[in-house]
């Protein structure tokens, strides 16, 4: 699921076996709930990403299902802090790791874990957060 038709078309070119949906993530619901939702570099493009976390928890995941989120744009990753200005993408939200963890907790996720992958120099790495419904 992606809000960009260009990304959907690219995915279809690279992988003809699976189904892809172009939709606003806050409006879309799967026909059947799933066990795993993985997202990379998406959540901070939402004005209120906590609403998306709640929506996935309530409408996409089975009981015991897992959300896995990866983002590079977060406060502790200093080189990413000026992306909003560098890219002129005004909707990018910058939050701390603790704020992202609070979004998961508030939605109801349990067994929440977080870590950074790919740390190198000033680059703090991709922040990965996962939790279970």
Model-identified regions with their sequence ranges:
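Short, glycine-/aromatic-enriched active-site segment of Class I SAM-dependent methyltransferases
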Residues: 72-91
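Short alpha-helix
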Residues: 91-107
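Short catalytic micro-motifs in class I SAM-dependent methyltransferases
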Residues: 41-42
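Conserved beta-strand signature within the Rossmann-like core of class I S-adenosyl-L-methionine
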Residues: 64-72
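A conserved beta-strand element that flanks and buttresses the S-adenosyl-L-methionine
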Residues: 38
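Core SAM-dependent methyltransferase catalytic element
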Residues: 116-133
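A short glycine-rich, Lys/Arg-flanked "PGG" loop and its adjoining helix->strand segment in the class I
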Residues: 50-64
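Class I SAM-dependent methyltransferase SAM/SAH-binding core
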Residues: 1-27
């Amino acid at each position: 699921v992606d809000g960009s038709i260009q990304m959907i078309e690219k995915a279809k070119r690279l992988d003809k076996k699976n189904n892809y949906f172009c939709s606003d993530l806050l409006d879309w619901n799967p026909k059947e709930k799933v066990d795993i939702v993985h997202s990379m570099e998406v959540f901070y493009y939402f004005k209120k990403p906590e609403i998306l976390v709640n929506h996935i928890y309530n409408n996409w995941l089975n009981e015991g299902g897992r959300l896995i989120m990866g983002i590079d744009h977060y406060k502790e990753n200093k080189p990413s802090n000026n992306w909003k200005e560098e890219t002129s993408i005004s909707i990018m939200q910058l939050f701390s790791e603790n704020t992202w963890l609070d979004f998961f907790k508030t939605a109801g996720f349990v067994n929440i874990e977080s870590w950074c992958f790919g740390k190198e120099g000033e680059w703090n790495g991709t922040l990965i957060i996962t939790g279970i419904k």
